[in-house]
Amino acid sequence: MAQIICRDLTIGYEGKTVVQNINLSVKKGDYLCVIGENGAGKSTFMKTLLGLLPPVSGKIEFYDGLKKNEIGYLPQQTEVQKDFPASVREIVLSGCQNHLGFWPFYRTKEKKYAEDMMKKLQITHLSKRCYRELSGGQQQRVLLARALCATRKILLLDEPVSGLDSQMTEEMYRLIEKINREDKITIIMISHDIRGAMEYASHILQIGQKVIFESKENYLRAYTKRSVLGNTGGKK
């Protein structure tokens, strides 16, 4: 079942068109890796999906009962975020805000769900620690737990391994893959680490002057063919 469909979508910001003619269908349980050069429009695409930026033209359609405020989002970290003076538990619990409606306090079910997500991400022992005292890998686990509190259906991850060393990067990829496989949560992830990110992906969206949306197998087959033709002097 499709969760998100983009039809002839053109995206941009401040009156500037960045990417044109994005057509894709993301189904429940897909793992979509979004790739492209710096400044190609990857983060603009993600912000448009979230409703933080309006489409220039075209449509984004949500299915499977999905609402914009039910999408878990892990943005790129900034230095301000890294120095945020709150406890791990407070940050994870804040991911439940969209479920409160007009209720002014966190209820037992939100608190339990936050505890469950901390357990899943293996950060329960850090719950009383100040976020800014944590390592980069621990901080990313906290933010991922927070994003999971916002959704049971789909996660949007913008450079989730940025600034992590190779060991922490691999741990984060395995964790995201486990969430996708075991919990059937759809993943849409931006990453500059193309090789590492694509290892677990089911689909690839390449954003740039040319937009390509394919299954990983078809994308890699076409990429290999282009490389062979280029190396043998064939037509590109």
Regions found by a protein language model. Name each.
Residues 58-69:
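Conserved ABC transporter NBD signature motif
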Residues 108-126:
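Conserved ABC ATPase "signature" region
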Residues 155-158:
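Catalytic Walker B motif of ABC-type/P-loop ATPase nucleotide-binding domains
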Residues 202-216:
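H-loop (His-switch) and adjacent beta-strand-loop-beta switch element
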Residues 191-192:
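H-loop/switch region of ABC-family ATPase nucleotide-binding domains
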Residues 130-134, 138:
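Conserved ABC ATPase signature
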